[in-house]
């Protein structure tokens, strides 16, 4: 009988830790530290454990992609083995529970010293390798012990100044120094937490370049401040915060190792974790390639994205903050948010990974895009992008149990007040005589592509209408007419038809959606279908959509 201890690691309070600041450099450093805490630092902690106990350990390296590499802990050769790090968790095996506790102490100490603000949660459980399922033990730990420990954890109360002290501008904790001057940002008071985040920015940037840039794109840099995200001088400038998350990936991780032997479970989880991580990286690489290909040099030697706006000092108007795996957050120029989110979802679908039955299956995902003014509070924008992503996921679940990629967005031309549901109830719900129920001005969320004949709320349909408004002779350069149409749509079908007739719009119809169930022309002539307006979203997005692939 071979007994081992399973350890599962997780972190809590990550969102406020990463996104609580309105300074991009602090967000960048925070994201890097979180990724290190339960991955590379866990491997390093195993190395330190080895030195303390003078026994061999094995820290599986996914970069080498050898999921069955020896030595194995069940062969009595190891004191500890890293099973996998992925899906938000890190799982390890120890030959003795004391080693598991010792390892956790080593890792916890480093996090306290180098990443104050990250809360590590660890649970341990002994199990019999020969008679128990490792898969089941890990599932029980995650569903029961880990959740219970998170709920019962007493939130830490940081010790504030005991005398006359200055406070950090970002965290309101006791300041320990001043930040270094960076670009136009003057030095400011910082706490130790912010100090560590800023110290990590260089390493975060280097890692991002190594993972995502190739020989074509390596001349470009990732921006460290939002003002370098493509901001146009003299214009109102916007930044887009995009959060994307795979559909049902938690369940996919749960089911993947089911009904396998313990060693086969370890191999399977390593393969799945590696393939999901690589899928996300590959999708982001393609996003960058398409963005780089869209940058053109004009007659004055200025580099512009599709001729629309200039990029400064070779800074790409795009920056991933959380990446690797199916859970991704990136920021970009506000005019690129919708397009880059759609490209990312499309490219992610092209990266099939093995399913529980061993057959390749594409990753479907949803994305939420929140476009706000450049210096709008970042934490709030991220929170809304998460809400929008959840909205898109609910849309997928409501559609007859089909699995597809979808996206939802909000374009905040001014401020934001309330949740997404409150904003839409207040600004996008109208009572018009054509429908008994309250009608919806927005067609969002939309599916990435047409899945069946009746689908019309699709990315292709939406972008076709936006481009028509921007380029067709009936509408191009006639912004007042478009704005007038937007207000008329609020009044319903009859008012819309009168508008089309009075303005002598060709065929007395709005831009056609791709044909669906024979209703495309009907929608174009009325502007509404089944209580949903097909054109309000497109009009709103005219200044926030640039096609990069045409």
Predicted features and spans:
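Regulatory and interdomain segments flanking nucleotide-handling catalytic cores
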Residues: 1-550
């Amino acid at each position: 009988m071979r007994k081992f201890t399973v350890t599962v690691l997780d972190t809590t309070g990550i969102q406020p830790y990463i996104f609580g600041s309105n300074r991009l450099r602090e967000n960048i450093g925070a994201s890097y530290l979180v990724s290190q805490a339960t991955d590379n630092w866990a491997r390093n902690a195993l190395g330190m454990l080895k030195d303390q106990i003078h026994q061999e350990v094995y820290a599986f390296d996914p970069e080498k992609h050898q999921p069955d590499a020896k030595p194995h802990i069940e062969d009595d050769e190891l004191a500890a083995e890293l099973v996998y790090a992925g899906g938000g968790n890190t799982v390890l095996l120890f030959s003795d529970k004391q080693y598991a506790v010792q390892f956790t102490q080593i890792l916890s100490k480093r996090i306290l010293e180098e990443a104050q603000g990250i809360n590590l949660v660890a649970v341990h459980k002994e199990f019999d390798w020969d008679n128990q399922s490792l898969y089941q033990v890990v599932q029980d730990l995650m569903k029961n012990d880990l959740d219970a420990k998170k709920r019962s954890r007493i939130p830490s109360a940081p010790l504030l100044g005991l005398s006359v002290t200055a406070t950090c501008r970002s965290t309101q904790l006791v300041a320990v120094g001043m930040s270094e001057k960076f670009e136009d940002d003057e030095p400011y008071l910082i706490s130790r937490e912010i100090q560590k985040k800023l110290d990590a920015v260089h390493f975060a940037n280097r890692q991002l370049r190594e993972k995502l840039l190739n020989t074509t794109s390596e001349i470009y840099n990732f921006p460290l401040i939002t003002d370098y995200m493509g901001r146009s001088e003299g214009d109102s400038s916007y930044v887009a915060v995009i959060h994307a998350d795979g559909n049902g990936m938690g369940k996919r991780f749960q089911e993947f190792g089911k009904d396998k032997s313990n060693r086969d479970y370890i191999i399977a989880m390593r393969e799945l974790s590696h393939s999901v991580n690589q899928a996300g990286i590959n999708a982001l690489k393609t996003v960058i390639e398409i963005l780089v290909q869209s940058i053109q040099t004009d007659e004055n030697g200025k580099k512009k994205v599709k001729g629309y706006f200039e990029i400064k000092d070779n800074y790409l108007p795009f920056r991933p903050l959380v990446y690797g795996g199916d859970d991704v957050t990136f920021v970009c120029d506000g005019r690129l948010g919708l397009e880059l989110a759609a490209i990312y979802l499309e490219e992610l679908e092209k990266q099939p990974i093995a399913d529980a039955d061993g057959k390749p299956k594409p990753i479907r995902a949803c994305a939420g895009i929140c476009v706000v003014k450049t210096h709008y509070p970042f934490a709030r924008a991220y929170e809304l992008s998460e809400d929008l992503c959840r909205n898109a996921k609910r849309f997928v679940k409501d559609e007859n149990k089909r699995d597809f990629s979808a996206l939802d967005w909000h374009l905040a031309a001014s401020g934001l007040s309330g949740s997404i549901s409150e904003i839409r109830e207040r600004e996008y719900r109208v009572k018009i005589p054509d429908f008994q129920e309250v009608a919806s001005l927005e067609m969002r969320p939309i599916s990435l592509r047409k899945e069946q004949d009746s689908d019309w709320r699709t990315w292709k349909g939406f972008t076709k209408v936006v481009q028509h408004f921007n380029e067709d002779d009936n509408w191009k350069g006639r912004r007042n007419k478009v704005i007038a149409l937007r207000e008329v749509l609020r009044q319903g079908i009859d008012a819309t038809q009168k508008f089309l007739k009075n303005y002598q719009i060709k065929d007395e119809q709005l831009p056609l959606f791709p044909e669906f169930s024979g209703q495309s022309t009907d929608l174009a002539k009325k502007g509404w279908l089944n209580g949903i307006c097909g054109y309000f979203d497109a009009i709103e997005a005219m200044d926030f959509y640039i096609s990069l692939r045409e």
